[in-house]
Amino acid sequence: MFRLRRILGIILVLAIIAAGTFVVLDVLNSEAANGKPADPSEQNKDDPTEEPVIVKPEKPEILDHTVGLYTGRGSWDVDLVALRNFLADHDIEYVEIDQETISSGDLNQLCDILILVGGFSAEYLNHIENHANIRTFVESGGCFVGFCAGAYYACSTMRWEGNAYDYPLELFTGEGAGPHLKWGSLAAINLNPEISFHSDFPDAVEMWYFGGPCFTGYDKSNVDILARYNANDEAAVIAFNYGRGRVLLLGPHPELGYIPSKEQVQTDGSGGALWTWLYAALQWLVSEKPV
């Protein structure tokens, strides 16, 4: 009798264990059927079709415009190297244009943005024979960008060391005056917070100065002042509409870096160059063209 009770007790225990195992297996099967594995760490382990979600950073907007880079008489070779590097670094397509092409070529077919670099504005004046061709380009919807000498060239009056000279391009009906800082100075620049893309930059930056103009004597209602020199509070960078096009003029050089101790200009984006700001300025320029 005792042995029979013992056997019946063992059978009862085994039945209870079997029933519990059945319940657990039923729960697991139910979760699997509903797509919920019991162990989250096992999710996707044996299912090659399920891939983890990768969040990629948003790419910056591409400046999808062709630049015409003036490389003719008067252009500063060092500045040309810097701008070629800048354009290549930002995957911006460009063509090189000499004084003959800029005078007689169909610029609107060649490029969307025409850049005149630093150098010698008097050489631009004397060796570009047809200044009206540039005006036609901008009036027809092109963008003109002038750095330093290129900015002087665009002004109706160029003032150098107190002496005034009339210039014929006259995109800007005002005066470009300089120099007002020592060549090779790191100029303190105050950015205008009302310019939309400046929300991504501090209010004050520094740009290298190599004799460029400040801009005076103009109708301020028609001109966007992007930046001012901290030293005299005069306009350092301006932009405005011209016909169906747009003009950007810069006194300082955001495209260049400089090592004063070596008197060495940097052309690779180092040494205090502000390539990020310059790229944003070009994007803003083309986006603000008249409709």
Where are these regions (language model features)?
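N-terminal Sec-pathway targeting helices
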Residues: 1-14
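Mature N-terminal, pre-catalytic/accessory segment of carbohydrate-active enzymes
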Residues: 19-24, 47-70, 76, 85-88
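Hydrophobic single-pass membrane-insertion segments
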Residues: 22-35
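Extracellular ligand-binding/catalytic regions of CAZymes and related secreted enzymes
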Residues: 39, 44, 48, 53-55, ...
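Helical hinge/lid and interdomain linker segments adjacent to catalytic or ligand-binding clefts
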Residues: 76-160
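Short catalytic/ligand-binding loop motif for oxyanion handling, primarily in non-cytosolic enzymes
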Residues: 123, 153-156, 161-163, 234-236, ...
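Class I SAM-dependent methyltransferase SAM-binding "motif I" and its flanking Rossmann-like core
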Residues: 155-201
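Catalytic beta-strand/loop cores that center a nucleophilic Ser/Cys/Thr
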Residues: 185-258
